[in-house]
Amino acid sequence: MQKLINSVQNYAWGSKTALTELYGMENPSSQPMAELWMGAHPKSSSRVQNAAGDIVSLRDVIESDKSTLLGEAVAKRFGELPFLFKVLCAAQPLSIQVHPNKHNSEIGFAKENAAGIPMDAAERNYKDPNHKPELVFALTPFLAMNAFREFSEIVSLLQPVAGAHPAIAHFLQQPHAERLSELFANLLNMQGEEKSRALAILKSALDSQQGEPWQTIRLISEFYPEDSGLFSPLLLNVVKLNPGEAMFLFAETPHAYLQGVALEVMANSDNVLRAGLTPKYIDIPELVANVKFEAKPANQLLTQPVKQGAELDFPIPVDDFAFSLHDLSDKETTISQQSAAILFCVEGDATLWKGSQQLQLKPGESAFIAANESPVTVKGHGRLARVYNKL
């Protein structure tokens, strides 16, 4: 059991105050503190103190004894800690993204390698051969977009902007997946006069439309006034997660985080195809080839947890990670898994022990539990979040 020393990513969209207000993390230079990373990602691994008292990378520690620390099954299947755990603090909208599935990631990665596209090139889509399933768990009210709305809903929302682009009128005549695909690509492809005219029609519709999703379009327009992604809340479900609610983000499904603080768990991948709300490169043909143009009703988007005593388990449809919450009390309970785990203190305080070793966690602090240290005993007040594998 080792307490983690974690790094903060200072992306421009991050909140300057959330990590300080929630977890007392200092921000003397008033930087945006977008993400706190917990894990062993090569870009920014957590660190731990070793037996000699030196501060070392968790990635290096795991590398030295994978089977013991990760567990036999995870070491064999993934060869590394297969997940990255984050606290994400969005003060402004992130780009609309789509993550390719595993098969397409393998093909795309090999193709771009063969073409000799450098890893850091703006037009590089595939940074690795992995998929990137994600779970987001709200710590504060959290605004997001996820998956296409039901087509009847899209039709009704597009009526006030029917004249903005011929592809909108075309979709309204026959609302089906193929025409939605054309509409999606056409809106992203808009340039110059065509784009200015479409956005002017959308903005004039805002004057007469109230409630959602128009309110979300207004919010986004404060940050991206000239981005064709402003049409996306008319096509995608706008989701407001209350604290304690969670949502899984499937491959090939457009989504965006807009505002709020959440825990996010993801597979170890950087494969992102952007689809708006970004100054970065958008590869429209590759994007459209990796999107499933199918509707997902908003009432099916939340992940329903399963309660087992003091544990809330959030079922995940992939093996890359599992996520659960533990309500703590003065009564000792055990936490066990066949894999490594990262425990994060969401609120209150936690005391963990294994044999003679004891560890205290305060809000915002986290610990790495090796597979061979399971089970650990825990008690306290408040809540722990646990990320691990069910292999």
From Swiss-Prot:
GO CC, alphabetical: cytosol
Alphabetized UniProt keyword annotations: Acetylation, Cytoplasm, Isomerase, Metal-binding, Zinc
Compartment annotation: Cytoplasm
Record PTM N6-acetyllysine, positions in chain: K280
Source superkingdom: Bacteria
GO terms for MF: mannose-6-phosphate isomerase activity; zinc ion binding
Binding-site positions, Zn(2+): Q97, H99, E134, H255
Pfam short name (any one): PMI_typeI_hel
Active-site positions on this chain: R274
Biological processes annotated in GO: carbohydrate metabolic process; GDP-mannose biosynthetic process
Keyword Transmembrane helix attributed: no
Cofactor: how bound: Binds 1 zinc ion per subunit.
Enzyme kind, highest EC tier: isomerase
Catalyses which reaction(s): D-mannose 6-phosphate = D-fructose 6-phosphate
EC number in record: 5.3.1.8
Cofactor(s) named in the record: Zn(2+)
PROSITE patterns associated with the record: PMI_I_1 (PS00965), PMI_I_2 (PS00966)
PANTHER family xrefs: MANNOSE-6-PHOSPHATE ISOMERASE
Family: Belongs to the mannose-6-phosphate isomerase type 1 family.
Function: Involved in the conversion of glucose to GDP-L-fucose, which can be converted to L-fucose, a capsular polysaccharide.
Protein name, entry field: Mannose-6-phosphate isomerase
